[in-house]
Regions:
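Conserved PLP-enzyme active-site core in the AAT-like
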Residues: 8-9, 128, 144-323, 388, ...
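N-terminal entrance/gating region of PLP-dependent enzymes' catalytic architecture
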Residues: 15, 34-121, 127
Length: 404
């Protein structure tokens, strides 16, 4: 056992390590890893450079490494496909950085009313934006939200097949397949890909009709989709799914809803999407989140895997309280017997989302949506004039488009 203490790790003091090992009845740290086969363990010390001698040297080293980064703050960026460098108003960062919210402490179901109220505002504002009444607290990502929604639909219908567009983001499709589980698992859900029209990048309606049937639990469609196209026949897709006894799950970019119709208006049963455009920075793989929303009906509410926030009158006249509801049916309440499994890694972003939505309001969303439409179509026309560059679908998109 090393006798050298690490300056930033109190438990690295040799006497403390010895006391902890004695408490658990272990003779050495190596004994803690005996369950790992010997041929899977590294039998030599790690080849690490010499330790930096001081905090000042560590700071210089980190600043030197960070100076090599290239960010979207200093370069024109066309990054997208699920994570975008939208402007984040300073007030979003200010509020989520406050000590009332930026804390590892988790309140009980009926305490912590300030944070609970902020979460309630997130749910109610997002519900108004997407045209739905019941919005759960966010999950890890857009893909996780889609996976959970498909599992909800399978439980609701008792069917084990979902139709998705062949144009779906490959990474999101991989997450969905993971949620639908391997074929050997009894709760496996078969993922069937529906062709898309190469001329418009929209779902091929003929192929959808051919594959929609009595085994279909849900049709999952995104608008705008991964290739950027707006699914102009989303209402007809919902009608066909309903006629087949299937649920319609619609995935959206919420920032598009200042100019596009909310999914609730054209027949969506379950709505999912990303929360990242709503006041959250791109952040090295972080900063993402997904939401799930439905109508406020018992059959849907009982299938939510997420934590949910509700409002109730109190004994004080005109006063209201905010707290968790339906927690017993989640993995928080029932553990392995819960409807599904989720975590709380993006709840802070829900507060940033609420601040962003309240700051913009309906007119702000319309303004942002129109600006995105104007700039994306301007960019498409400008790129199409470049020799050797082709934009195969020149219209019918919101923010993103394909370039050959």
């Amino acid at each position: 056992m090393s006798q050298r203490a690490h300056p930033y790790m109190a438990n690295s003091v040799a006497a403390i390590k010895r006391a902890m090992l004695d408490e658990i009845g272990a003779g050495s740290i190596a004994e803690l890893f005996e369950q790992i086969p010997a041929d899977h363990r590294l039998a030599r010390p790690l080849n690490l450079p010499p330790a930096l001698p001081s905090e000042a040297a560590l700071r210089r080293h980190l600043l030197d490494a960070l100076s090599k980064n290239k960010s979207c703050e200093e370069h024109l960026s066309f990054l997208g496909a699920g994570c975008w460098p939208h402007h984040v108003p300073a007030i979003c960062d200010e509020i989520v950085g406050r000590s009332e919210f930026l804390t590892p402490v988790w309140g009980t179901p009926s305490s912590d009313h300030g944070r609970n109220q902020a979460w309630f505002e997130f749910a109610s504002l997002l519900g108004e934006l997407i045209g739905m009444e019941f919005v759960g607290l966010p999950v890890y990502s857009y893909g996780c939200a889609a996976g959970h929604a498909i599992r909800m639909a399978a439980r609701l219908t008792g069917r084990r097949e979902v139709l998705v567009s062949a144009s779906l983001d490959p990474e999101r499709l991989a997450v969905i397949r993971t949620y639908c589980e391997p074929e050997a698992v009894p709760s496996h859900i078969k993922v069937v890909r529906v062709a898309y029209d190469r001329a418009t990048h929209r779902l091929d309606m003929a192929d959808l009709k051919a594959k929609l049937g009595p085994r279909t639990a849900a049709v999952y469609v995104e608008t705008p989709n991964y290739l950027g196209a707006i699914e102009s026949e989303a209402g007809e897709i919902a009608r066909l799914a309903r006629a087949a006894g299937a649920e319609t799950i619609v995935g959206v970019d919420p920032i598009s809803l200042g100019v596009l119709a909310p999914p609730g208006d054209y027949g969506a049963d379950i709505v999912v999407g990303t929360t990242q455009p709503l006041g959250v920075h791109m952040n090295c793989g972080g900063g993402v989140g997904g939401f799930i929303a439905t109508r406020d009906e018992e059959r849907y509410a009982r299938e939510y895997p997420t934590l949910n926030i509700s409002i109730a009158e109190t004994l004080g006249e005109g006063q209201y309280g905010f707290g968790l509801t339906l927690a017993h049916q989640t993995s928080y309440g029932m553990r392995e017997q819960g409807k599904d499994w989720t975590g709380n890694s993006v709840y802070l972003w829900a507060i940033a989302n609420a601040v962003y939505m309240s700051l913009l309001g309906p007119e702000g969303f319309r303004e942002v949506g129109r600006l995105i439409l104007q700039r994306s179509h301007y960019a498409a026309r400008a790129l199409a004039r470049v020799p050797g560059v082709r934009v195969p679908v020149a219209g019918g998109f919101f923010k993103e488009f394909v370039v050959d």
